[in-house]
């Protein structure tokens, strides 16, 4: 967990903050790790059970409650839609952030198992999936070079904070290299998108 996040949430605890509302698993974990019992309300995070934020859906326990978008579960459907929209596609680079997964409480084995699950789905459609690890914005040039070197004919963006920050870079890459990119949110401006609208799932009022 990033030290800066822990410091922020420890300061919140000391100032008597009543509740924390967040849209990321990383922040939710930071609140829990900072100690205390500040309630955490989440919206649009990935599977809270798999990342260890709750004990079960029926009886979550602890201090975390809210909504999940199960974004990882949508990846197989995204692969299927990508193939339907671009029939000639044969090799997809999956832009993921293993470090984001670790900060959200996932073990390396869980991250690897998730990729293998996606790969299996891709193989059933006659596709090859290439892991494209982007843990920081500075990793983008190397990732873009890998897409070209591996001759991937499509890029699938996992719903990570890093890919959200790099959305303009991905659109520019897509235009310059003529390689279709699929995101999880249409606001990114990629050729394709499939996923929940963050504006619709965010709290209002």
Question: Model segments located where?
Answer:
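Short hydrophobic alpha-helices and adjacent helix-cap/hinge residues
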Residues: 1-205
């Amino acid at each position: 967990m990033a030290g800066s996040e822990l410091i922020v949430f420890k300061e919140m605890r000391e100032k008597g903050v009543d509740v924390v509302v967040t849209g990321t698993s990383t922040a939710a974990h930071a609140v829990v790790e900072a100690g205390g019992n500040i309630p955490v309300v989440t919206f649009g995070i990935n599977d809270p059970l798999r990342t260890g934020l709750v004990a079960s859906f029926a009886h979550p326990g602890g201090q975390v409650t809210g909504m999940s978008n199960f974004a990882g579960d949508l990846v197989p459907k995204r692969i299927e839609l990508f193939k339907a929209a671009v029939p000639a596609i044969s090799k997809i680079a999956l832009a993921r952030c293993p470090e984001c997964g670790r900060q959200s409480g996932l073990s390396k084995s869980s991250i690897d198992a998730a990729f293998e699950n996606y790969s299996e789905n891709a193989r059933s459609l006659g596709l090859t999936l290439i892991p494209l690890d982007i843990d920081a914005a500075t990793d983008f040039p190397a990732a873009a070079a890998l897409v070209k070197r591996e001759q991937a004919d499509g890029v699938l963006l996992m719903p990570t904070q890093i890919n959200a920050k790099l959305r303009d870079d991905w659109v520019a890459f897509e235009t310059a290299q003529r390689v279709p990119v699929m995101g999880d949110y249409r606001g990114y401006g990629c050729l394709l998108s499939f996923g929940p609208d963050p504006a619709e799932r965010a709290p209002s009022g």
